[in-house]
């Protein structure tokens, strides 16, 4: 019997990124993917041609990219391994919340089905990764998780509103400076905060834009508008 060839790490990373951008209602086009992966546009163009050829993605007349059912299943399989690995690194190995994304990116491509099953059993079938994102297969309809939870971006919350952090965008988990800043300031899933108002400076990440202050556990924290758009909250 012919064994299906495993996907390359690069293909899996593209499928993950497209899935996450689709989930967060971001427009997925070649130029945006080039920005995310820090590669030249022609590199992305060639990869998208391959993904279309192999039946993983479709492109409309505006060159917007969406996953096919095959692509969606493949993306969820690798995201499941990624988020389970993050959970294992935090819960079992004691690594810090902000340290595990890169490690999981390296390990996710090599985890067998047997190891995945053992991790699930050991961790009692967790439903989210340490950053609050859903684990496909452990959460029904993971792709619509944000909509089902009624989540909104922190940047859209009005002054004086009290909200709870649901998750941090998977799309920006590789922005180490931002993830470390959120960790240090206690802006993690489950944290309740109050939006206080505009602030003249910039906080979190390297964005030089306007920012606003939030109150967390009685402390005032400054976060940039760009960074706050990467935090999903619920009222």
Where are these regions (language model features)?
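Basic amphipathic alpha-helical segments that dock to polyanions
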Residues: 14, 33, 44-54, 182, ...
